[in-house]
Each structure stands twice: as structure tokens, then as C-alpha cells.
Amino acid sequence: MKSTPITSLGDYVERVTSEEGSGRMFRGHSSDAFDLIPVAGRYKTPARSLKSKQIADEKYLLNRFRREAAHLLPSGLSDWELLFVARHHGLPTRLLDWSRNPMVALYFAVESRSKGTAVVFSEDYLPSVDTTKTPDPFVVSKVRRVIPPHMTHRISAQDSLFTIHPDPTAAYTSKTLIRYTISTNLKGVLKAQIRQLGFHEASLFGDLDSIAQKIAF
């Protein structure tokens, strides 16, 4: 994995727009201590290290989300669609969120006030899952890209796509992965600059909480 320090917003834009590959996707982390591990795999225990137990736990959470959020969800959601919505609202799943837009990833890297180096990951094209031919997310056997329908404001505003990880406890890496690092001192500067360009809580989340956060910043 290639690692490159970023020195300014212009430097970042120049680097990401000069990358090879037409299918690049981007993901921002507020700390370089975080690996590319889905939330469902971040709390590994001896029992959950068993694949059957891991899947059972995830399905339990997903079914509970479907049941308890039924009054807020469109009817007839497929398992994939439910998984997309659940992940965007914080449920632990085997999905990782990415964006086609490098500025969205930069927002998620620098929006936190936490100290330390932030990171934007950039990955080249991965084979996609055809969700119509593979209706069960839990039978996917390799890390794959998943392209969701623009079924919610968040998915559309964030130009979202996902990767699905058959072993969510394993950190993802590849030879085509690029890691852009952002120093603590630069994070606040970049956050202010991209807000002026329209990348902020209200534009990317579009709910009352995010609008209030934008005003309060």
C-alpha cells in the first residue's frame, strides 16, 4: 500500500485527480490508527471469530433493525437495501462505506476534532456484486464493491458505494490501495476550506441534527 502525505487542499486535489484508474473510490478516517475493518468485525471475541456465529449476530441485528424501524422504512426492502440503510445509520454490518467523490472522503477524514493524523484511502476498481443475482449478502465469498440505488438522501448526497467483507474481522488491504495522510495541524484548515466548497454536515446528511451542527460550527 502506497502512503503519501498531503500538504494542502490543492495538493490533495491534484493527487487524487491524477490517479490511474477510472473506478476509484475513497474513504476517510479521522485517525491513521484505524484499519479498513467493517464495524461488525471490530469487536472480535473467541465466540464471534466463528464464521457461523459472526453471521448469526449480524443477521440478528439486521432483523431487529427491520422490525423496530419498520415505521420509518419503505416497504419491501431487499436484504441488500436494508443493509445499505442500516449501515448509513450506524448499525454494525460487514459493509464499509466509500464514496466516488474524494471531497466527501476528505470531509470524513477532517471533520472530527480529534488529534492525530487523518487518512483518506483510495482504491482502484473492484469487481461488483450483482445484487439481483446474489440476493443474500451473506453468501458473498470475496471482498467486492456494491453499488446501491440512490434510495436515500444520504446515499445520493455522499455519492455512496460500499464494499462487502465476507470476513469482517480481517483488515482490508491491496496493492492498488493508496493512503493519503493529513497532519493534525492541517485538518482544521482543510475542514474550513471544504465547508466553503459545500461539503459539510447539512449537505451530506440533510437532516435537522446536521443542519444544527453546521450552524453551530
Task: Give each language-model segment a name.
Residues 1-217:
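Catalytic-core elements of nucleic-acid end-processing and repair enzymes
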